[in-house]
């Protein structure tokens, strides 16, 4: 981890990170984080009864548990604004909301109706304006006019699916769904699977998302703010997430180890100089401290922050290159999966920029109208 941050610091005058995802690999010392969090979230409907430590409340926006049988969101109401504009309601035609109408539940309803949550994204994805049923096309080919085509409503206690079709093309379906949602206090509950993955998610107020899988491996999607400047800000954001995450684990799992790790993490946050932060991170790695010793890069992108004032020559890019140009002028390096990957493509990027500058200078010095076609091809296509 310290070597990665050292290199990102070395190039931060030219490159800034955008997407940054990483994993914390499960290890035996930490216990069953997934199972214990699942048990706590499943049995409670108040945020305070799950997250006892009030010091970390401002950092955590929402907890989500999702499996095949149940999806449950627990929201921290204090992290949401008051929604006064009814035009912000995003989901009323997708959901039937059941609530006990208490003040707490009514506030949760207001938040649910105004926030674009993962439930809204899921139900929008499963609502299909037009879908071709190829099985029914096959019936038409082999069965003639007597083939049966389904249209109508299918429903259970929590999900109603309406299938409509055109009489002239009955194999083309329009599918709409409505989901029942039960809101009690801080909890938003629906039955059945509402996500591709079975995970526990912790959504932070800074938009960072931590996904915990059944084996307690974690996937962390680190958010990026416009005011993030350089590697030191990135380290502070990551270790701020660590600090609050580990105190949450200590809260729920009752494992003192996480409190000790949170204290070590806090030393990194308190350090003011980058060199001091990197030194502390290196020491954490040497002592096999959770969060550093089991850190594994998932994927990250870099963007070249300086303007490209010269002509861009796409012919210099390999077909499978991770160097991409956005709108012709913005250079991005995408899907980097290791420090070696990063250093390799930054070197390629630097060399390519220099080659483009040289070609651009030559191109600007010649008369395009009188120059030979072969010479122009050599500049533009090779």
Swiss-Prot record:
Keywords: Activator, Transcription, Transcription regulation
Superkingdom, natural source: Viruses
Database matches in InterPro entries: Poxvirus_intermed-TF
Functional description taken from the UniProt entry: Acts with RNA polymerase to initiate transcription from intermediate gene promoters.
Family, as annotated: Belongs to the poxviruses A23 family.
Assembly behavior: Heterodimer of a 45 kDa and a 32 kDa subunit.
Stated name of the protein: Intermediate transcription factor 3 large subunit
Organism lineage: Viruses, Varidnaviria, Bamfordvirae, Nucleocytoviricota, Pokkesviricetes
């Amino acid at each position: 981890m310290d070597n990665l941050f050292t290199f990102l610091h070395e190039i931060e005058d030219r490159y800034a990170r955008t997407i940054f995802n990483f994993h914390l690999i499960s290890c035996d010392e930490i216990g069953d984080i997934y199972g214990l969090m699942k048990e706590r979230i499943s049995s409670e409907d108040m945020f305070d009864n799950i997250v006892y430590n009030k010091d970390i409340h401002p950092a955590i926006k929402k907890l989500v548990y999702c499996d095949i049988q149940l999806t449950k969101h627990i929201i921290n109401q204090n992290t949401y604004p008051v929604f006064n504009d009814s035009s912000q309601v995003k989901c009323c035609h997708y959901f039937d909301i059941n609530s006990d109408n208490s003040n707490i539940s009514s506030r949760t309803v207001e938040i649910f109706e105004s926030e674009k949550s993962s439930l809204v994204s899921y139900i929008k994805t499963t609502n299909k304006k037009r879908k071709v049923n190829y099985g029914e096309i096959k019936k038409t080919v082999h069965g003639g006019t007597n083939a049966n085509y389904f249209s109508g409503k299918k429903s259970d206690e929590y999900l109603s699916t309406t299938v409509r079709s055109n009489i002239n093309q009955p194999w083309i379906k329009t599918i709409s769904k409505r989901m029942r949602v039960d809101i009690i206090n801080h909890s938003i509950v629906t039955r059945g699977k509402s996500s591709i993955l079975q995970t526990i998610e912790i959504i932070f107020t800074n938009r960072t998302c931590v996904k915990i899988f059944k084996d307690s491996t974690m996937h962390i999607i680190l958010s990026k703010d416009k005011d993030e400047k350089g590697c030191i800000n990135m380290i502070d954001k990551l270790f701020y997430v660590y600090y609050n995450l580990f105190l949450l684990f200590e809260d729920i799992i009752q494992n003192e180890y996480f409190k000790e790790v949170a204290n070590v993490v806090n030393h990194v946050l308190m350090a003011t100089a980058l060199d001091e932060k990197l030194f502390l991170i290196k020491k954490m790695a040497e002592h096999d401290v959770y969060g550093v010793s089991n850190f594994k890069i998932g994927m990250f992108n870099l963007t070249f922050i300086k303007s490209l004032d010269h002509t861009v020559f796409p012919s210099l890019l390999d077909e499978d290159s991770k160097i991409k140009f956005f709108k012709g002028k913005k250079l991005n390096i995408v899907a980097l999966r290791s420090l070696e990957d990063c250093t390799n493509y930054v070197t390629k990027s630097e060399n390519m920029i220099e080659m483009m500058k040289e070609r651009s200078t030559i191109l600007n010095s010649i008369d395009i109208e009188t120059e030979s076609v072969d010479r122009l091809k050599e500049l533009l296509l090779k």
